[in-house]
Amino acid sequence: MDAPIHRMLNALEPGTYLPPHRHKNPDKEEVYLVLRGSLLAILFDDEGNVTEKVHLNPAEGHYGIEIPPCVWHTIVVLESGTVIYEIKQGPFAPLIPENLASWAPPATDEEAARVFMQRMLEL
């Protein structure tokens, strides 16, 4: 938990919802490297407007994204069996409420999360 760099393999399936969040206070960069499968990495401004949408798929030569500190972001998994390698500066800091986007549904609201992810795909 106190390591200077945190690394995690994460296996994800379509329908997995990662609420939009940021890493602020402490400010941390985050890197996603897609090892298998594909996903959309989506960045937002403070009002929830999409500022960037990046399709990551190693079969197409698009492997990863580095997300700057304090930038709102989420992912939408596109392919079954997707595996990502996440790298973030340590030490571990759990997400606090101010770092979860108030303009997006919470993880506990499955239907709203499904609708949100569908909307992200249609943009």
Where are these regions (language model features)?
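Double-stranded beta-helix
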Residues: 49-50, 55, 72-123
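Short beta-strand His + acidic residue motifs that chelate non-heme Fe in jelly-roll/DSBH
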Residues: 20, 41-43, 65-67, 73-78, ...
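Extended, positively charged loop/linker patches that create polyanion-binding surfaces
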Residues: 41, 45-66
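His/acidic/aromatic-lined binding-pocket segments of jelly-roll/cupin-type domains
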Residues: 9-10, 29-34, 65, 75
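Glycine- and acidic-residue-biased ligand/ion/polar-headgroup-sensing regions
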Residues: 27-46
